[in-house]
């Protein structure tokens, strides 16, 4: 298990075989992947360096609280990125992602000592057998609460 000190750590994961996936081998409602990622404050600082987003609400409690936030928040794009990773792992090729959209509904608070655990469940939301495209719906939660709304990934199954 990765404690998240080097980056978002995958704590557990599962997916159906991504061998030769076609729309005819899937059903709406089927779970295709699930994962948990641990985030630490170190992850946030490293992500800030990679992204260039050094807003101190992502690493300083005093600044976050001074602007009315309950604590340090994970970067939205970091949350969005880790949320799609189980789908990329399942489909086997990031180039098969045709579209990815989310709504940010709640922040992920990253405690200085305990960090945060983000849970992702990916299910088939719709299938188009003519184009061999699937819509994968993501349920992304932190502390049992959904943090990304209408998180959907369109993937090519060809």
Ranges and model annotations:
Residues 11, 16-74:
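Catalytic strand-loop segment that frames the active site of acyl-thioester-processing enzymes
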Residues 51-52, 64, 98-100, 116, ...:
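Short, charged/polar low-complexity linear motifs in solvent-exposed/disordered segments
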Residues 70, 79-121:
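Hydrophobic beta-strand-centered segment that forms part of the acyl-chain substrate-binding groove
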Residues 37, 107, 129:
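Residues that form or immediately flank small-molecule/cofactor binding pockets and catalytic motifs
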Residues 39, 104, 155-157:
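Hydrophobic residues in beta-strands and at strand termini
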Residues 1-6, 11, 18-32, 110-158:
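HotDog/MaoC-like acyl-thioester-processing domains
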Residues 74, 96, 130-132:
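Short loop/turn segments at connectors of secondary-structure elements within structured domains
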